[in-house]
Amino acid sequence: MKYSDLKYLAVDLPEAVMKEKWSGNFTGARKAIRRLLMSEGISYPLRCRLELELNNLDYIESRYTLSEEEALFVMQKRIPSMTAQELEELRIEDKADWMYIDGKVKFIDCFDATLYKVYPELWSATENGDESDYSLIQSVVDNAVLRMGESGQSKMTAHIHIRHDFNLKNEAVEKGKRLHVHMPLPLEKGSVKNLKIIKISPDCTSLPQKEDIQPTVYFDIEAGDGQVFSAEYEFDNELDYIDLSKANLEEIARTDVPEEEKKYLQEEFPHIRFTPHLTELAKELTGGETNPLLIVRRFYDFITTKTDYRFVRDYCSIDNIPEYCALNRRGDCGVQALLFITLCRIAGIPAVWQSGLDAKPGDVGEHDWARFYVPSIGWVYADLSYGGSSYIRGAFDRWNFFFGNVDPYRVPINDGFQKELAPAKIHMRIDPYDNQCGEAEYDDRGLTGAEVEYRYTEIDIR
């Protein structure tokens, strides 16, 4: 199966598999898949879909591991008075992600991680209340607006110096075999200025090229004990603040989208799909509006006010990510970004994925956001998860800021979703869609997320 065959996730599963899967009988689902794969007359797209589903089942089963009793124990660490009935209400309301596994309710291992960020009734029930700290971001917003008012121009800058380490767990090391490792690495383009690659260890086989959409440093090496792959770099992230509320709507309306940007209007299976539901949703939200900027603002408002920010299972185990977000009205940063991108493209507005790291002093981790094209203005940003967190806290200046802007405390690496690495991997990627943590494989098999470790070390962020 080729990397491009991921598009066949758009193929529906046979009913025999679906019945077993959603009843929680994963053993039965695997048996049904293997029986179908051995039968004659299976088309290539369906064969790929069934093979992908075997992988999906493994991911789902590995994540939905907490029993009801274990989940209640987790909740009681923050809310000691939490009862089993209250947990059940969270499950019924679909605020606590769960699934049937072998006939039993199992919660996803991260079900509680975002509850206290999203639902005021839960964070107010904890001893410390809302522990989210947005003071740095608020200062960025305040200063950007102030400088714009004083001079008409406002630049936002952060200096970021980090090290990314990646290694195989001991039990995954097969000494003497050829090991292939990809690690994400930013390129000097866009907002990334003065990039310095300080150290790559061990010696790499190749560095990313400027045309790479998901750039990586690549190692082709003999596997051995104690190997740690490391990339240390620093750069300045420089962004210009823009206040889209003051944009010239008439000029936007009379300016056409350039031909070179129209490639960002296309579907990209299996996820960026113009399904009947999403097409009608875009039409409903548009409501007859014709100005591109006002249309996009309606999409932004819908996602940031009507969908909940929630950690989700691995993307490779979700068949259609934007549809998942719209139907369930929840998703993490990338899920929300993909719904936004898809709605924009349906409406004829170019939009594209961007991802990398959220890099604030004391906190470095993966993050995804979106960019969209405004005629007569150009490419601007939308961060749906930061926008939603601002809205729920009544910080409407921050909410408006993240429509058109992102803060500079991030490492932009990837300029597209579901793009091939260079050189191409042989086997299924740990993350087939994004490139933030690292990938590894031997010639004869791919390595899973459970077989590797990675970490980001802050050296200097200011």
Language-model regions, residue ranges each:
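Hydrophobic/aromatic-rich core segments of domains that either
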Residues: 3-6, 10-23, 59, 74, ...
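Intrinsically disordered, low-complexity N-terminal segments that are enriched in acidic
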Residues: 22, 30-242
